[in-house]
Amino acid sequence: IMTIGDWEYYEKSKNKDVEKINKIVGKIILINQDTKKFKILSMGHRNPQGLFYDSINNLIFSTEHGPQGGDEININTSPDSKIIKNYGWGKSSYGEHYGYPDNKNLDLYAIAPLNKSHKEYGFLEPIKYFTPSIAISQIVKTEKFTNEKYKHIIYVGALGYPSQISEGDMSIHQIFIDKKINIKKHNIIPINERIRDMIYVKELNKIILYLETSGSIGILQSIN
């Protein structure tokens, strides 16, 4: 499974390839390692950052950067689905254009209105969005760190800035999700480092962190 972002400003793009089903820009794809062929799983993505495949529940969890705000957490279709989901970029976003408002760019805003709803315009809503942005990064999933019984427990990293730690930057977000894909609880664990990457090591029951600020490796583990 691979993510591909929108490699240029949507509103300034001549081709709008994010919206085209025959283009891989702004998509999440599944690659067959034997045949080298791929299929599109979802579209309408701006800048996917984190990706985790839950093989037990056959679900794809992903994160992506919004523009100025509007970072997203999405639960994607299973790789077996024949339905291509559309998350709406650049028609819908909970972020804003950089420099908005700017009267010189009114025509560009019309091309990419960044509507503050996905569902109303025929797209899928993120299960969580962040405004202001937390500079979202990797996502991992494990239910082994806590005795609380939830269907899904995810851990989401954030880059960002020291001045915005109180808003969730430079932290790990522990999010509890029920069977109906409703968020029931959200804990923020300040790390005071830009968290670039994370990986869950099942054999150790630990999450290994790549901390970009100091260029070091961190370990997140349960103390229960």
What are these regions (language model features)?
Residues 199-224:
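Blade-level signature of beta-propeller repeat domains, shared across WD40, Kelch, NHL, RCC1
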